[in-house]
Amino acid sequence: MAFDLNNFVIDRVVRGIAVSQGDNEKLGIAKGDVLFSINQITNPSLNCTSESTDAVDALSVPIATFYRAKSAEFSAENALFDMNLIATQSGTKKQVATAATTIDTPCFETIDIEAGKTAYTLAHLPVAEPKVYVLKGDGTLGEKVVVGSAANGTTIVISEKAVTIGDGYAAGSQLFFMYDYIADGTTGNGAVEVMNSANNFPVGCKFIMEILGADVCDQTNLIYAYLVFPNAKLSPDFDWSIATDSTHPFSLKAMQELSLLTM
């Protein structure tokens, strides 16, 4: 007997994948490339609407209704913040630091002063001379530290990654360093970047969502259902609450699928 299904019981959404509809030389994306793949989807919702026009008689009584201009919008949240998703929402691509494509990266670093120790090493090689402050007990910044050519009193010396302090700091005190470094993907020197620019917007995509469920009459055999948007546009609008329990929201609109015929 041919497979048939009517009443479908949903267990959960397994994953959602968006693939590129075409080549994008600017972003280095080829047709069919995965733009993002997420597997922590929560609160998925599909909203379908249309516009109606009523035909009326001489007394303005509706005698017929015609519908046109269908539209569909899908919205959901990913339980985890996803770099590829926000890159697609921003109309760009996630950049990973390598030797060929380095990333200028900011760094906040704290050094704990130990008794009798004057030499310390920064985690990264600064691009320019770091700005240094005394770190107060409540975590706020105190006096600015002078960086000189000789370590004396509260004056310190910075040579590449090496830091030499004077004798003006008590054991247990802290110095706060602010600097930029070049991430090149080597061990301990990696970075990932997503840039949201004013002139970049999401590209068209095909979105496929995998849903796990079962026939209401046979819940022992699980069935995979697929919700497919052949021509979709991810919205660049999103509200991201930056907190431990926050989610990553996204929405997309379904577009009419058109084919360009060539002779």
Each PLM stretch: what is its role?
Residues 137-138, 157-160, 165-171, 222-263:
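Mixed-charge, glycine-accented linear interaction segment located at domain edges/termini
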Residues 78-82, 181-183, 211-215, 231-236, ...:
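Beta-strand elements of well-folded, non-transmembrane domains
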Residues 73-77, 176, 206-208, 249-253:
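Beta-strand secondary-structure signal
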Residues 39, 47-49, 77-79, 114, ...:
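A structural detector for beta-sheet-dominated domains
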Residues 25-27, 83-84, 168-174, 185, ...:
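Short, surface-exposed beta-strand/loop "edge" segments at domain boundaries and coil↔beta transitions
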